[in-house]
UniProtKB/Swiss-Prot annotation:
Belongs to the alpha-ketoglutarate dehydrogenase family. Gene3D superfamilies: 3.40.50.12470, 3.40.50.970, Multifunctional 2-oxoglutarate metabolism enzyme, C-terminal domain, TPP helical domain. GO terms for cellular component: cytosol; oxoglutarate dehydrogenase complex. Keywords: Glycolysis, Oxidoreductase, Thiamine pyrophosphate. It catalyses: N(6)-[(R)-lipoyl]-L-lysyl-[protein] + 2-oxoglutarate + H(+) = N(6)-[(R)-S(8)-succinyldihydrolipoyl]-L-lysyl-[protein] + CO2. It comes from Coxiella burnetii (strain RSA 493 / Nine Mile phase I). InterPro entries: 2-oxogl_dehyd_N (IPR032106), 2oxoglutarate_DH_E1 (IPR011603), DH_E1 (IPR001017), KGD_C_sf (IPR042179), ODO-1/KGD_C (IPR031717), THDP-binding (IPR029061), Transketolase-like_Pyr-bd (IPR005475). Homodimer. Part of the 2-oxoglutarate dehydrogenase (OGDH) complex composed of E1 (2-oxoglutarate dehydrogenase), E2 (dihydrolipoamide succinyltransferase) and E3 (dihydrolipoamide dehydrogenase); the complex contains multiple copies of the three enzymatic components (E1, E2 and E3). Its cofactor is thiamine diphosphate. GO terms for biological process: glycolytic process; tricarboxylic acid cycle. Its EC number is 1.2.4.2. The gene is sucA. This is 2-oxoglutarate dehydrogenase E1 component. GO terms for molecular function: oxoglutarate dehydrogenase (succinyl-transferring) activity; thiamine pyrophosphate binding. The keyword Transmembrane helix does not apply.
Length: 934
């Protein structure tokens, strides 16, 4: 094999799959003989283990030791084993505990009946208790270079088989693995909590338990999804919040499901008891909002810590478990980027999962896959699995998942997982410190599997005994975590039973008085954390705003982003596009869609509004029209024209996303809820695929304002249009978005000209109105010679909610008016022009905004044609799809009494479109001819 220099290897990405075998071979050779590899690699490999307390052992050596052990009979006399072989056996024992110790860790508060794993027994390595007094090298396992086997074995049992089970041995990064090993073996066992810390942990458990008991007696039978059994979550979050602030984190966004949410609201977030009681008693006034149940409510507040205040936000959450995860990540990314750049340690995501949903919901995998991508990384999230070992009525792991642990999906991230017994609150707090320190060191996700139980049924009124009799017999006899820990501290004389009783009484007294249970800052002092949404409250969609720009400015901006460095070696097609854009910028040729769209972005960036556009092919554009990022054909180097407009411009964030819809759209929605001053766009590769993200659309985008009073200006680009590409590449399912529209909750538009998309995008940001915008974007129309605009359309025009007839006809001679939306207009226009002068009795009106519907504009337009008795709605989509059913009553409302409304389009169809090209052409020609009476 030829020698490869380090520089060459890095250029080819030495972490790539096709290089993995080669680099592993080099590393194995290095471990056997450092001089067997060249100096560059030798130096590099040494940096991997620099500072590690234990040297790596090559896989070949370990395999050979196992072969040697297998060849020797078990009854071999200890005296016959050489000291080197004994040391190797001890090395394997240590490695075995690092890899498999978690299998016998005491992590289940209800008792663990797992058999002892043979790989954790001395005999597996040909060692016995008779070897206990022999001395071996420890390689940093203990605080001395050598120790007896008994000391080593005892230490291994204490570290790896106590209340904490650790999984980190499969992490591929040597530096991370060494860091975790040293932390687990050196720092974690040395953590000693002082008296005050232990008393604080107990006080946190008192608050967790006392709240649930108080609510259980005050609001009998009301559903609250009690935390009981998982009480250690409260000291965990308390420690996490305080330690995060000490490490300079200023904001934490927490997302969680319903279990324990009420407890977190009061005991961590600082919501007052009086506010919560209003929810229980149904006294909260939501006005015109629908509101939501108390265990879905979000909250935000500045909580005091001894290191300063920290802003905590608990994300609003639907019952659709885990879909909040990418939403919370997006919110954190926006908060980080608001700080004059992507500051990963300014804000952090804490995700609290259920064991059943974490291993069961596919959105979890999407969120994890996003965590290290350029478009979506947030510097690492803390994941807490509230593992109560049951999902509603399903407690058999063979039904709940196909893996040993509910956390096993985390292995895909090469991330550490810490399983911890919820009945050992000190271990819980210690693991919390470890998890946060790892996140801060490596900016990667980390997982805490908080193994606990659910004291009641799924709801407080639900009886779990019919389906989990054995488990709940144990739970009924099992003391609470607070009881166990209080007993422990009382026995150690760190507190008295009377003190504990007094803490409980004091807590209940504060609840009786409706007080806050956590010290927070007054709301007026916390404004610097939050984006200012005040200008957007109470605004109407009809608010007018000037979206034009002076012609001179338009030309200058167009020239800036269309002029690329001469050093770039462009693809010939891309070069032609940018050459054409320069001519458009000069006004020599009409502009196409791609130019107008880029011009809209450039203008907003120059005015100080950042632009974030993310989708599976968004940098180039699925249909090769955008090219917001261009690539040097010789070096592969990227160049983003929109980053080079001016020194004071805002930042563009244009990324290709990973191949997912729900997670990616959820992320962008979350981003948009935390930054009203950015144009945030998620683009589907084809509109057809957006229904993979239907939960995000249904539970967040369309209803977030109504349920939670949450504004969002997110934009959805959904390529839509019937062009013979079959049922999976034709329809964005327009009908579904229109069906969701009510109370001006969002906007649905189908712009058909470049000037329309320019004004539409600028309106979305410049107008003091923040509601989601669904845009049916074109495909073939991107290059349709009829779909062009001039610079004057941008300098003097505005967004038209509908576009009237564009050709000159005598209004009195018009007897038939065709109303349509989207690409079908150009099919109608082309066909009408084929029949020159023969169809002058037909006028065509494009409705560009389908919701909120432009009643006044359409009514005024129809009034222009006094003799038009026939009004036609023409659409490409089947009759049971498209805009027809959701729009016809609106059309009728705008018509005169002497007018009739007819439908022209495809018949009702189970599939969105025909799969056969010939059938598509036939049906398309039929509907166009029928609309034009040909």
């Amino acid at each position: 094999m030829p020698k490869i220099t380090m520089q060459q290897f890095q250029k080819n990405s030495y972490l790539a799959d096709n290089n993995a075998g080669y680099i592993e071979t080099l590393y194995e050779n290095f471990l056997k003989d450092p001089h067997s590899v060249n100096e560059e690699w030798r130096s590099y490999f040494r940096t991997l283990t620099n500072g590690a307390s234990t040297p790596d052992i090559s896989h070949a050596t370990i395999r050979e030791e196992f072969r040697e052990l297998a060849r020797k009979p078990r009854s071999i006399s200890p005296t016959a084993i050489t000291p080197a072989a004994e040391q190797a056996a001890v090395d394997l024992l240590i490695e075995g505990y690092r890899r498999f110790g978690h299998l016998n860790a005491k992590i289940n508060p209800l008792g663990d009946n797992r058999p002892v794993d043979s790989r954790l027994e001395l005999g597996h390595y040909n060692l016995t208790e008779s070897d206990f007094n022999k001395t071996f090298a420890t390689y940093g396992l203990l605080n001395k270079p050598k120790a007896t086997l008994k000391e080593i074995y005892t230490r291994l049992r204490e570290i790896y088989c106590g209340s904490i089970g650790v999984q980190y041995s499969t992490i591929s990064d040597e530096r991370e693995r060494n860091w975790l090993r040293d932390y687990v073996e050196q720092r974690l066992p040395s953590i000693e909590f002082d008296k005050e810390t232990k008393r604080n942990i107990l006080q946190q458990l008192v608050t967790a338990e006392s709240l649930e008991k108080y609510l259980d007696t005050k609001y009998v039978g009301q559903v609250r999804y009690s935390l009981e059994g998982g009480d250690s979550l409260i000291p965990l979050l308390d420690e996490l919040t305080k330690r995060a602030r000490h490490q300079k984190i200023e904001e934490i966004v927490i997302c969680m499901a319903h279990r324990g949410r009420v407890n977190v609201l009061l005991n961590i977030m600082g919501q007052s008891a009086a506010e919560l009681f209003q929810e229980f008693e149904g006294k909260k006034d939501y006005g015109l909002m629908s509101g939501d149940v108390k265990y879905h409510r979000g909250y935000s507040r500045d909580v005091k810590t001894d290191a300063g205040p920290i802003h905590l936000s608990l994300a609003f959450n639907p019952s659709h478990l885990e879909f909040i995860c990418p939403v919370a990540m997006g919110s954190v990314r926006a908060r980080q980027e608001r700080q004059n750049g992507h500051k990963r340690d300014y804000a952090m995501t804490v995700m609290i999962h259920g064991d059943a949903s974490f291993s069961g919901e596919g959105i979890v995998m999407e969120a994890l896959s996003m965590s290290q991508t350029r478009a979506h990384h947030v510097g690492g999230s803390i994941h807490i699995i509230l593992n109560n070992q049951v999902g509603f009525t399903t407690s058999n792991p063979h039904d709940a998942r196909s893996s040993m642990y509910c956390s096993d999906i985390a292995k895909m991230l090469d991330a550490p997982v810490f399983h911890v017994n919820g009945d050992d609150p000190e271990a819980v707090v210690a693991v919390t410190q470890l998890a946060l320190d790892y996140r801060m060191a490596f900016h990667k996700d980390v997982f805490i599997d908080l193994v606990c139980y659910r004291r009641h049924g799924h709801q407080e009124v639900d009886d779990p005994m019919p389906t989990q009799p054995a488990m709940y017999k144990v739970i009924q006899e099992h003391p609470t975590t607070r009881t166990l820990y209080a007993k422990n501290l009382i026995e150690k004389k760190l507190c008295t039973a009377e003190e504990v009783d007094q803490w409980i009484d004091d807590y209940r007294d504060r609840l009786d008085r409706g007080r806050q249970l956590v010290e927070t800052l007054p709301e007026g002092l916390s404004a610097h954390y939050a984006a200012n949404w005040t200008p957007y409250l109470g605004q109407d969609w009809t608010t007018l705003v000037d979206t034009t720009l002076p012609l001179k400015k338009l030309k200058a901006l167009g020239k800036k982003f269309s002029t690329l460095p001469n050093t770039l070696h462009l693809h010939r097609k891309v070069e032609a596009i940018y050459k054409a854009r320069l001519e458009m910028a000069e006004g020599k040729t009409p502009m196409d869609w791609g130019f107008a769209e880029m011009l809209a972005y450039a203008s907003l960036l120059e005015e100080g509004f950042s632009v974030r556009l993310v989708g599976q092919d968004s940098r180039r554009g699925t249909f090769f029209h955008r090219h917001a990022v261009v690539f040097d054909q010789e070096t592969g180097k990227e160049y983003e024209p929109l980053k080079h407009l001016s020194d004071k411009q805002a930042a563009p964030h244009i990324y290709d996303s990973l191949l997912c819809e729900a997670g990616a759209l959820g992320f962008e929605y979350g981003y948009s809820t935390a930054d009203p001053n950015s144009l945030v766009i998620w683009e589907a590769q084809f509109g057809d695929f957006a229904n993979v993200a239907q939960v995000i659309v249904d539970q967040f985008i369309s209803s977030g304002w109504q349920k939670w009073n949450r504004l969002s200006g997110i934009v959805l680009f959904l390529p839509h249009g019937y062009e013979g590409k079959g049922p999976e590449h034709s329809s964005a399912r327009l009908e579904r978005y229109l069906q969701l529209c009510a109370q001006n909750n969002m906007q649905v538009c189908a712009p058909t000209t470049p000037s329309q998309i320019f004004h539409l995008l600028r309106r979305q940001v410049l107008r003091p109105y923040r509601k989601p915008l669904v845009v049916l974007t074109p495909k073939s129309v991107l290059r349709n010679k009829l779909a062009v605009s001039s610079l004057e359309d941008l300098a003097r025009g505005q967004l038209k909610l509908l576009i009237p007839e564009i050709e000159k006809h005598d209004p009195k001679k018009i007897t038939r008016v065709i109303l349509c939306s989207g690409k079908v207009y150009y099919d109608l226009l082309a066909k009408r022009r084929e029949h020159k002068g023969k169809l002058n009795h037909i006028a065509m009106i494009r409705i560009e905004q389908l919701y909120p519907f432009p009643y006044d504009e359409l009514k005024a337009e129809l009034e222009k044609y006094p003799n038009a008795k026939q009004v036609i709605w023409c659409q490409e989509e089947p009759k049971n799809q498209g805009a027809w059913f959701c729009t016809r009553h609106r059309l009728i409302k705008c018509m005169r009494d002497d007018q009739t409304l007819e439908y022209v389009g495809r018949s009702a169809f189970a599939a969105p479109a025909a799969g056969y090209s010939a059938l598509y052409v036939k049906l398309q020609e039929q509907l166009v001819n029928q609309a034009l009476e040909i």
